[in-house]
Every structure is written in structure tokens, then in C-alpha cells.
């Protein structure tokens, strides 16, 4: 799976696998500190770029801890740090720059149009897609 935009786009089989894997992973974490990475560190060396047009403490922290627990790193970008077609930098340019530095992307926005445009423009590393 290379994106998770709408739950209706995921097959029942894939959704069951996601939930089963999450339950199994959560059970293995019982003895670990919440900042300690999972033993298999599946996202070691991977980088999540979180983009927030709408602030959310709970979303930001849950994604940050999840990526840490899976062995990766994260960067948070606030609305004032993003240039989606504003200030002389096009959304295409922004997506290209983000693609150079990130492996995984998360956008919290009110705009389905902006989300779908970013999805179309952002390039995700093919070796990461093959592992998932």
C-alpha cells in the first residue's frame, strides 16, 4: 500500500491485516518504554514529514511516537512553515523538496483538494513501498 487516504479505498482483507499486525505489534511493546524502538525497527533510517495546516497536539504526538517506536525519525512543519503555492514557491516545488528529504508523509488539512494534489506530486521511495 503506498497511501492511506480514505478507508473506503482499502479492501476488507487489507484492513484486517493492518489491524491484526497493529494488535500483534502492540502486544510486543508491553515491556518497552514508549520512546524505545521496537526490536525489529522496521522503519530504521526512514523519515516522516508531518505537515499541519491545522494544529493538533494529539495527532502530532501519536504520529511522532509511532515513527520513533518503529525506528524512524520525524519532522513537524506548521502552516507558517509550509508553502503550498504561496509566497513564490509552487505546491509542485514544495512536493519536490519534500520528496528529496522524506520517506513518509502526513498532512493534516481541511482541503481534500490539497491532499490529493500533494499525493499526486509527492514521490515516495520505491524501496520503501516494496517493504510494506
Q: Model-found features: residue ranges?
A:
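Conserved beta-strand segments of alpha/beta enzyme cores
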Residues: 3, 73, 125-128
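Anion-binding alpha/beta catalytic cores of soluble intermediary-metabolism enzymes, centered on
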Residues: 32, 86, 92-98, 102-132
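Positively charged, low-complexity intrinsically disordered leader regions
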Residues: 1-61, 65
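Residues at the C-termini of beta-strands that transition into short coil/loop
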Residues: 8, 78, 129
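Active-site cofactor/substrate anionic-group-binding motifs, chiefly glycine-
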Residues: 47-101
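Charge-rich, low-complexity amphipathic helices
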Residues: 40-41, 70, 89-90, 120-121
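Short N-terminal micro-motifs specific to bacterial/archaeal maturation
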Residues: 6-9, 82-85, 106
Amino acid at each position: 500500500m503506498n497511501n492511506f487516504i480514505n478507508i473506503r479505498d482499502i479492501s476488507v482483507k487489507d484492513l484486517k491485516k493492518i489491524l491484526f499486525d497493529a494488535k500483534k505489534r502492540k502486544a510486543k511493546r508491553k515491556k518497552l518504554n514508549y520512546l524505545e524502538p521496537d526490536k525489529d525497527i522496521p522503519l530504521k533510517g526512514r523519515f516522516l514529514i508531518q505537515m499541519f495546516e491545522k494544529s493538533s497536539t494529539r495527532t502530532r504526538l501519536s504520529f511522532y511516537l509511532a515513527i520513533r517506536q518503529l525506528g524512524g525519525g520525524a519532522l513537524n512543519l506548521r502552516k507558517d512553515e509550509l508553502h503550498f503555492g504561496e509566497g513564490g514557491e509552487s505546491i509542485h516545488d514544495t512536493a519536490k523538496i519534500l520528496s528529496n528529504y522524506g520517506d513518509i508523509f502526513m498532512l493534516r488539512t481541511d482541503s481534500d483538494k490539497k491532499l490529493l494534489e500533494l499525493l499526486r506530486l509527492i514521490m515516495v521511495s520505491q524501496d520503501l513501498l516494496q517493504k510494506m
